């Protein structure tokens, strides 16, 4: 299987790259790649940059250049549910934009003409949730938008709109949207690395 993995920052890319065998690193245009393998899987690891535009551009480039069988978005996120502790892992069953409003006839977070929420691939979700690890793994909704959320009033606004939201990040919504358009299975796995609750 060929797996595309997308991170936003160099620190995230380096941590994932440590797991790869037969590594080679290179740059194509604005994007940094590490290509390698895990068991019998070919891994294309990309650093796309922070935010939705970088994530969307990187995902398109990854899909068009490498034709991965699936895409995994991974990195750090802010926890917005009190059940989460720092260093817990959140795997998305769904993802939603917390900063999109297209007017009447659309749900908050929905881009007109697209689903209100993007679904994570069920097989990838089940695989992640079944891992035998001492780290706590939570599955649910990730809220994505172009802002690093630290203000309590903004957090409360997100929680009011998306009661079941577990974490916030800045890239997964765009990655999900591109994978939906290109019909590529996608999963989002994030480490809760800072306090927002």
Kindly label every feature range from the protein language model:
Residues 8-11, 50-57, 66, 84, ...:
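Conserved active-site and cofactor/substrate-binding residues in soluble primary-metabolism enzymes
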Residues 1-60, 66:
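N-terminal short beta-loop-beta anion/metal-coordinating cradle
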Residues 70-72:
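Structural motif
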Residues 169-187:
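Short glycine-rich, acidic/polar surface loops and turns
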Residues 80-163, 167:
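Mid-sequence, gly/pro-rich, charge-dense loop/helix-turn segments that line enzyme active sites
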Residues 190-197:
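Single conserved hydrophobic/aromatic residue that forms the stacking wall/gate
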Residues 64-67, 184:
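Glycine-rich phosphate-binding loop signature in dinucleotide/nucleotide-binding domains
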């Amino acid at each position: 299987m060929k797996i595309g993995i997308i991170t936003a920052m160099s620190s995230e890319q380096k941590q994932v790259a440590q797991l790869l065998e037969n590594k080679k690193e290179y740059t194509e245009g604005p994007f940094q790649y590490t290509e390698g393998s895990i068991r019998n899987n070919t891994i294309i690891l990309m650093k796309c940059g922070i935010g939705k535009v970088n994530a969307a551009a990187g995902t398109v480039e990854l899909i068009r250049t490498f034709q991965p069988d699936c895409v995994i978005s991974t990195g750090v996120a802010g926890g917005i549910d009190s059940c989460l502790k720092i260093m817990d892992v959140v795997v998305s069953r769904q993802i939603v934009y917390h900063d999109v409003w297209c007017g009447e006839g659309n749900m908050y977070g929905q881009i007109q003409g697209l689903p209100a929420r993007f679904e994570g691939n069920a097989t990838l979700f089940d695989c992640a949730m079944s891992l035998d690890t001492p780290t706590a793994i939570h599955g649910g909704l990730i809220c994505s938008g172009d802002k690093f959320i630290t203000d309590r009033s903004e957090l409360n606004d997100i929680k009011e709109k998306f009661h079941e939201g577990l974490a916030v990040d800045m890239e997964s919504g765009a990655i999900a949207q591109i994978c939906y358009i290109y019909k590529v299975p996608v999963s989002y796995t994030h480490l809760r690395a800072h306090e927002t609750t």
